[in-house]
């Protein structure tokens, strides 16, 4: 019996840096008698000996993998054959601040230009104190900000007087009033409802949970439904909610607070049903913040404010780059070179 048995064998060769020696001729100008030097080749200007590929890799490994300077120095030596000190790593991050912040500003402008914006926040640590990391995102851009306050002024400053059509957020007070209207995160409401049920409410919370789950199920099917069908579903959900909220207040404390809040914010629950571009949760924001939570737990965050600024800008570049089909390394390298990472159109 004859035939062919084919299989693949995959391996990595030893990784070694490419070192390019630059020789620049120097002399004396015969006219003015001043010393002159030959210009440096483009991309090989004097300064740091490390090229953009190393800079992007260092930032990538530190930001996305939460590798400390000490471990990163050892990893670069043992895996990549590159001797680099912790001080040099810090210098790479410091130099990256200007181009990364510039790229982040472009990303922020893209978020502000969006009709639908989502936002969330989590705590951060800077110089041993509690700060806050905010994320503001659209379908095409994700912007991170690390600041010392959780107040609504953070968002007000970010928006620069611009008001999106719809603001997607949880019920935190600092998230209120930034859009023309709000879409409340139904995932957060389901958690609040679950808590009320566990606390003993057997009337309002279970019925409200059924309405929310029905709304979520409709939201998952929106792309396959006609506009007229969605309008009918929206009217039906409003009727169910009106009937539920026209009843007596619950006697259990957490259920009563939820009941009163829903009476106040009832208009903010089902906007997504007839707006396919509006999510029914702000889970995208929570996913965008999750790597930062891991980074905080692993590294205990930042010893200096500039480190927080670089991290937020790099996180914005990486997350936005992924929306546009770029890897973290590709997005960072483009941003460091001043190349746009967002596709136009």
Residue ranges of model-derived segments:
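Short, conserved DNA-binding cores of transcription-related domains
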Residues: 1-30
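Catalytic center-proximal scaffold of phosphoryl-transfer enzymes
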Residues: 19-345
């Amino acid at each position: 019996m004859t035939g062919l048995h084919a299989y693949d064998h995959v391996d990595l060769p030893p990784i070694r840096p490419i070192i390019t020696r630059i020789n620049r001729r120097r002399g004396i100008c015969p006219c003015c008698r001043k010393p002159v030097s030959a210009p440096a080749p483009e991309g090989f200007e004097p300064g740091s000996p490390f090229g953009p590929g190393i800079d992007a890799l260092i930032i990538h490994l530190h930001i996305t993998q939460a590798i400390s300077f000490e471990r990163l120095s050892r990893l670069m030596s043992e895996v990549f054959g590159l001797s680099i000190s912790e001080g040099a790593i810090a210098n790479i991050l410091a130099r990256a601040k200007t181009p990364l912040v510039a790229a982040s500003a472009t990303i922020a402008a893209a978020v502000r230009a969006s009709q639908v914006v989502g936002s969330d926040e989590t705590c951060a640590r800077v110089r041993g104190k509690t700060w806050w990391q905010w994320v503001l995102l659209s379908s095409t851009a994700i912007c991170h900000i690390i600041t010392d306050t959780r107040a609504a002024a953070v968002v007000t400053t970010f928006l620069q007087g611009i008001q999106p059509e719809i603001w997607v957020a949880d019920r935190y007070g600092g998230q209120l009033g930034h859009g023309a209207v709000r879409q409340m995160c139904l995932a957060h409401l389901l958690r609040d409802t679950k808590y009320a049920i566990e606390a003993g409410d057997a009337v309002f919370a279970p019925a409200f949970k059924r309405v929310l789950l029905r709304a979520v199920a409709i939201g998952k099917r929106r792309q396959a439904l006609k506009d007229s069908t969605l309008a009918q579903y929206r009217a039906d959900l409003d009727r169910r909610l009106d009937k539920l909220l026209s009843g007596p207040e619950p006697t259990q404390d957490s259920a009563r607070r939820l009941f009163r809040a829903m009476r106040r914010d009832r208009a903010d629950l089902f906007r997504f049903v007839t707006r396919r571009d509006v999510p029914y949760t702000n889970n995208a924001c929570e996913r965008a913040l999750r790597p930062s939570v891991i980074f905080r737990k692993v590294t205990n965050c930042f010893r200096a404010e500039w480190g927080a600024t670089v991290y937020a800008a790099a996180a914005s570049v990486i997350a936005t780059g992924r929306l546009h089909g770029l890897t973290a390394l590709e997005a960072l390298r483009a941003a460091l070179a001043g190349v746009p990472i967002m596709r136009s159109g």
